Amino acid sequence: MFALTAYRLRCAAWLLATGIFLLLAGCSEAKAPTALERVQKEGVLRVITRNSPATYFQDRNGETGFEYELAKRFAERLGVELKIETADNLDDLYAQLSREGGPALAAAGLTPGREDDASVRYSHTYLDVTPQIIYRNGQQRPTRPEDLVGKRIMVLKGSSHAEQLAELKKQYPELKYEESDAVEVVDLLRMVDVGDIDLTLVDSNELAMNQVYFPNVRVAFDFGEARGLAWALPGGDDDSLMNEVNAFLDQAKKEGLLQRLKDRYYGHVDVLGYVGAYTFAQHLQQRLPRYESHFKQSGKQLDTDWRLLAAIGYQESLWQPGATSKTGVRGLMMLTNRTAQAMGVSNRLDPKQSIQGGSKYFVQIRSELPESIKEPDRSWFALAAYNIGGAHLEDARKMAEKEGLNPNKWLDVKKMLPRLAQKQWYAKTRYGYARGGETVHFVQNVRRYYDILTWVTQPQMEGSQIAESGLHLPGVNKTRPEEDSGDEKL
């Protein structure tokens, strides 16, 4: 009887211990942190991306790029630090994203695809782009999908463009194309530009950011409807981080953050055209080296990026020290007599003096702007004032404020500047008529030149990206450049 009771007690103890163990295991499983909680606990948001002008790169001032800026804002929303990781190619990006302990998300100009891949999910879209077939100027232009048959075509391996071509091949079995994981969009455009391949397929935003580096490339036709870019997150049923991402992107769209980033990175592209891009490429080789040291010296003295000063000089005179306009402004920085005297310039035709004087003048204008105007808008406002004068710029700011816009944001004020040339508007201003539309173009051009100079001079540029052009833009005869006098009438 006692033995039976002891046996029952042992069984009860075993069952109790087992129950406690299972209960603890269940509690442990229930308390496993979500993806969002892990990010917040670690204090770091790990984001994987691609190294390209349209996504992420480093310049003199550090990390930058559309995707970087957007991811940085998201990290700030979460109250954590942003850590950027770069992938060698798209397959590598998705592989790292799906591995255990990998990055929290991918922000790399991705279009949702890979429907059969359960290891990845996509957020709400935030930027509409159009896939485009790219060909080389001077070659026969394809106008329809069947024209791709028989052409040398290369696209990024693992991209949505490769999926599009795979679908097209079902309709045209003779279609041939190559997928490569050893190149980036920049490389594909270069290969079309120099004739190594006949065609490629890229998104419209990538082309917009890169076309000026490759002035021979052209759009053949849009390959399908516009699609939205999205962030990618690891697959699974944990929606905590995904919900936060979607809420952030929706708010960024509603509150204008996405529009401001689009303006910053894409709002000033496509302003040069083929002739302007090709000419600038030549002048980078033939003219800038003569004056680069002067720009760098002024930039160092004034604590300003020398490439922005050089961009102003190019917009003003095409880097021609003897340039003269009908209004009497002269020299590489096109200074008036009054400005030259105020800046201590005794000879406007001396390139060193002109660069020093013009640079000093620009920095002075920027320093005198209201403190409420922050960078990068502050530099764009300074460019506008450099061109049109501070008084007219103030008229445009007041006009923006009356319209319910932000007088401290370039995106808003640039909408008002063209009104200064319309009587119904300038009649109500303090300083009257001004060619405000020209000022908008001036700022757009300087920003574009500045972007190009920033990209081609950045120290981290990799061998497969631009380096083959020897830090000069491709599409230019590098062996026998045509010399120019450097002095032309404007």
Curated annotation (Swiss-Prot):
Identification of the protein by name: Membrane-bound lytic murein transglycosylase F
Superkingdom classification of source: Bacteria
GO molecular function ontology, one term from the record: peptidoglycan lytic transglycosylase activity
Reaction(s) this enzyme catalyzes, per UniProt: Exolytic cleavage of the (1->4)-beta-glycosidic linkage between N-acetylmuramic acid (MurNAc) and N-acetylglucosamine (GlcNAc) residues in peptidoglycan, from either the reducing or the non-reducing ends of the peptidoglycan chains, with concomitant formation of a 1,6-anhydrobond in the MurNAc residue
Position of the signal peptide: 1-32
This enzyme's EC code(s): 4.2.2.n1
UniProt source species: Pseudomonas aeruginosa (strain ATCC 15692 / DSM 22644 / CIP 104116 / JCM 14847 / LMG 12228 / 1C / PRS 101 / PAO1)
Membrane topology: Peripheral membrane protein
HAMAP family: MltF (MF_02016)
Underlying gene: mltF
